[in-house]
Amino acid sequence: MLEHLRATDPIIADLIEREAQRQRQGLELIASENYTSLAVMEAQGSVLTNKYAEGLPGRRYYGGCEFVDAIEQLAIERACQLFGTSHANVQPHSGAQANIAVFTALLQPGDTILGMRLDHGGHLTHGSPVNFSGKWYNVHFYGVDAQTGQIDYDDLASKARAIRPKLITSGASAYPRIIDFARMRQIADEVGALLMADIAHIAGLVAAGEHPSPVGHAHVITTTTHKTLRGPRGGLILMGDDFAKQLNSSVFPGTQGGPLMHVIAGKAVAFGEALRPEFRQYAAQIRRNARALAEGLMAQGLTLVSGGTDNHLMLVDLRSTGLTGAQAQRALDKAAITVNKNAIPDDPQPPMKTSGIRIGTPAVTTRGMREPEMAQIAAWIGEVLMYPDDEARLNRIAGEVADLCRHFPVPADMVQVRG
């Protein structure tokens, strides 16, 4: 493996091998990360990286596209079958690119949008002032109820009536509960707004029937193709007949040039994998593991935003521990447990410190771990957060983590990916 790269650029080869070792020997609990199958990685590392293919299948600006046309058409058909939509655009390079394409297709600069507050679990591309969405549009925000930690739909409706937005965004990057897309469509219809569902985090759960689908409620749906969907890093737009033409044009030539055909091939493979029965079993186990891990963390005396989880992630409110999210992240890193610092609702700390950490189960579930392993992981996390400066203890836990991980290989070490 990597023999050509090692001969050409040994520095890069060494760094890749060290990263592979990190993934192999540690627990990946970042909610947005996962492991692709070997099949997806092979598609991405193929000769398709050499091919330009501006346009859509059958309507390219370059010759020699007969094979990449077939690949992209398969990706489109599989995406539509997986999510139950009539149209899909598989070309966005990322979830952010998918959102940019939707905004530029459906909005004019200065139009009003209503999105979820970033510190309440939203995403940068839903109106953050440091992002294009916050610079180009008139943004207002909704959030979660201070007592329950769950979306306050009554407040959302009140704000929508007051500002009459052109677009309401649903979906989040750090929200552990079910999103009521039907209720959000009712609110959107009441004020004459369009509804966009960004399901980047929950796409795999939606595809497997483990989270209510926005199809039939949202006017347009965006997602990434990694995270719970377990594909390559990329974006996807799903839509009906009403907006297909303008959304396709907004991707190309509106916001992108040539598509990444090697990534689209990886998407097609991942969509095919997600259509198999074992993917439904995998998605169900993600949620079972998340519930077990959440219960284990609370048994350690830790506080979870909203008191638990309905999906693949949970937010730990660290204020009772005296640690910031950044401090907790560093301590857990030393114990070979990877999480990310994350804001909690109305967080008093700045974004680079935060008062919370976000934890998710997609990656450890891909490795085949189940509820007993979640109980052990919760115990390790509790111990690290109680003794974050005890280097000997952290080193011991890192060794125990490595021992556990040897029994649950990552896909690169497998002949076949576990379900």
Curated annotation (Swiss-Prot):
Regions that span the bilayer: none
EC number: 2.1.2.1
Modified residues (N6-(pyridoxal phosphate)lysine): K227
Organism: Chloroflexus aurantiacus (strain ATCC 29364 / DSM 637 / Y-400-fl)
Name by which UniProt lists this protein: Serine hydroxymethyltransferase
GO cellular component: cytosol
Pathway listed: One-carbon metabolism; tetrahydrofolate interconversion; Amino-acid biosynthesis; glycine biosynthesis; glycine from L-serine: step 1/1
Cofactor(s) the record lists: pyridoxal 5'-phosphate
Molecular-function GO term, any one: glycine hydroxymethyltransferase activity
Gene Ontology biological process terms, A to Z: glycine biosynthetic process from serine; tetrahydrofolate interconversion
